[in-house]
């Protein structure tokens, strides 16, 4: 890679890289169970960190990352791409303005018909082994939809979680053996928050179904479907369904309201925050609660009952991989 892109400096030891005093920030783009040790080492070395999703391979490790961020006074940004779509921006403005009224239920839906990494033909085998990934469909894709809803709702604290995970459909036996496939391809859950708010979670890497309807938000005055974005309400006692001109919104933001563009893409937002042009969105906090929900579904499935968020916090353990010669 260094030769291909003419990168002059290359390292075999991450600690040596982090000793450089001319580096302000690093990007951690590794397998999930490597996120925590490298991120923590970078934060302790005085660097700001941009980390891939999910935050870590377990809630325990994600929390350690968050604590280190606070301790070191550095920025930690998690790649939560769905926070920066125009759909999300429009929905956020409507929710903050009270257009939906009291929000009481949301649905987080992610769908692939036959899209399991490696066994269905793309991606590396580490995606489907918990020793490297920590989880399956929930960790890989569910993180986007759950975090999007948490952001829109103001990142409420989960109270109770119930759910089940599944691996039911056939796959290539040779690739199953090579990858040691041991993660879920489908997950379903229900999350309770304060004041009666609930979240339904459905996430599929592989399912015999032609489509899911996508994520949605239900309020006392109106409801939103998020992709494609539509608004549903009663107007003068008549049912109304409305769509949005996203292309016009994109054009107007890029020409008239150019300052909004720092919130339209994760890395652009990160760079702007590093340059002091905008405050960083609380992606670390949102990703931490997302991880709590995901691990809660796993724990609930193992115990076949609803669990509290406190149980998840107390039982979560580190599954970080050992990295030789890494100091943190």
Regions found by a protein language model. Give the residues of each.
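Conserved SAM-binding loop
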Residues: 1-2
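Contiguous beta-strand/loop segments that form the cofactor/metal-binding neighborhood of enzyme cores
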Residues: 147-238, 264-280, 295, 310-328
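Hydrophobic residues in well-ordered beta-strands that form the structural core
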Residues: 11, 51, 76-78, 201, ...
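Predominantly a Rossmann-like dinucleotide-binding segment in NAD(P)-dependent oxidoreductases
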Residues: 75, 82-180, 304
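Beta-loop-alpha module in the N-terminal Rossmann-like domain of NAD(P)-dependent dehydrogenases
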Residues: 5-68
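C-terminal capping/lid region of NAD(P)-dependent oxidoreductase domains
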Residues: 74-75, 101-105, 299-328
